[in-house]
Amino acid sequence: MALVEYQRTTDESRLMALCALSAAGVLRIATTSFMLQWTHSVEKIPWQEDWQVTPAGFVLTQARVQGSGAGMEPSEGAVLRDGWYHYVPKIPPRQELVLAASGETVSGWKLCANGQCHELGTTAEQPIKITQCQ
């Protein structure tokens, strides 16, 4: 497997690292936060989630969806701002995130951190697993 590594240092906090494991290899990103974005396969509407990398796992801090439709009803307490429904999901920290990669949807996943975005799961392959790097 190939290893692609992006490092960044900061005086304000010690960065943690996430690893995205796919059939293509391992993408390692040193970061304390990231955004996942994808397009809903039926409604063709963008969806975004903001995640924090913490010792307890991945914490979903905010989500946004640009509209509503089949299976995309805004959550209770969602606020419509600039064409996006913003809300804070109430889920416990996750030890890993598993992203489907069918290659049959409108787009793959976009993982953004540290001002750079990476396309994942644009072709049919095994699910992509995002974990904290050891």
Spell out what each predicted region is:
Residues 73-134:
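Mature, soluble, non-transmembrane domains
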Residues 13-16, 33, 48, 82:
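Short, surface-exposed beta-edge/turn micro-motifs
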Residues 7, 37, 48, 52, ...:
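Residue-identity detector for glutamine
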Residues 21-69, 74:
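N-terminal secretory signal peptides
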